[in-house]
Amino acid sequence: MIEYRSVQEHLHSPDLGNYCAYGIYAYQVEPSSSKNILAIHDVFLNAADAISFVHRCNQLELSPVSLYDVIQ
């Protein structure tokens, strides 16, 4: 089973300085473990938007292959 999670990231940009963003991570979840299989960084600036997005991805059982397209 695939599970999506939002992850808070502390980043730095020469133009913006330090800032906080949220990435989207896909995990392959097994009964005894979970493994990160895909990470897309710096997707959202708002935590609520990131949480809502991963909730929809999990609810719709989105394939990791489609994650880049859905984010765009």
Where are these regions (language model features)?
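Short, low-complexity, polar/charged sequence segments that are solvent-exposed and flexible
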Residues: 23-26, 42-46, 60-62
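A short, exposed loop/beta-hairpin motif centered on an aromatic-Gly-Thr core
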Residues: 35-52, 57
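Short, mixed-charge low-complexity intrinsically disordered segments
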Residues: 60-72
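Short intrinsically disordered, low-complexity segments
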Residues: 30, 51-54, 67
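Short N-terminal "domain-start" leader segments
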Residues: 1-23
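Short aromatic-glycine-(Arg/Gly/Cys) micro-motifs in beta-strand/loop hairpins
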Residues: 15-37
